[in-house]
């Protein structure tokens, strides 16, 4: 547990954390710490908008771990990186009609469409890399993944209207 604590204490301060970055800045974020005196596990999420920066963040995390382990010569650690979410833009750019249709559906449902990047991972990213280009559209939700997460009935209705319009657009263009 001491080693895990030292690893956490030596993560970059003032940069590369969700609370100190914004927009298209990536981050390294510990999500779970479990352990006892003989074994500890730390789970992180690493997010960024390019594969190169994701690799840089993973290398930085490995460097922190390696540096800390030098202080504990009789200990060992492993770092396992599992791909979770990548930037779906590279897939969506190959299928521009998918985004165009979504934007049109939003307009048809009576709203002004805007395009934004999000910093979290989404199912749309996984689906896009599995061969089903899938941009994120709005749900109307607020304060995602927190105890105050909510969505209004009116926003849910607009989401449903958008989805109906989207299905109609795909049928019209088929």
Could you tell me what each predicted segment is?
Residues 32, 44-48, 58, 81-83, ...:
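Active-site proximal loops enriched in glycine and acidic residues that flank catalytic Cys/His/Asp
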Residues 1-56, 66:
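Midchain, well-structured core segments that form catalytic/ion-binding scaffolds
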Residues 37-39, 47-107:
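Metal-dependent peptidase/peptidase-like ectodomains
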Residues 44, 102, 127, 137, ...:
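Hydrophobic, well-ordered secondary-structure elements that form the walls
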């Amino acid at each position: 547990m001491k080693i895990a604590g030292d690893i956490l204490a030596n993560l970059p301060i003032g940069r590369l954390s969700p609370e100190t970055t914004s927009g298209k800045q990536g981050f390294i974020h510990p999500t779970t710490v479990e352990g006892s005196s003989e074994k500890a596990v730390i789970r992180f999420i690493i997010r960024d908008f390019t594969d190169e920066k994701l690799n840089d963040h993973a290398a930085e995390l490995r460097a922190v771990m390696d540096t800390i382990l030098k202080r504990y010569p009789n200990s060992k650690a492993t770092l396992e990186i599992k791909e979770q979410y990548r930037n779906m833009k590279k897939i969506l750019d190959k299928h521009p009609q998918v985004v165009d249709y979504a934007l049109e559906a939003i307009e048809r449902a009576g709203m002004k469409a805007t395009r934004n990047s999000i910093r979290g991972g989404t199912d749309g990213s996984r689906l896009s890399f599995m061969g089903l280009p899938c941009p994120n559209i709005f749900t109307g939700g607020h304060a995602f993944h927190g105890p105050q997460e909510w969505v209004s009935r009116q926003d849910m209705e607009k989401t449903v209207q958008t989805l109906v319009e989207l299905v109609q657009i795909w049928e019209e263009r088929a």
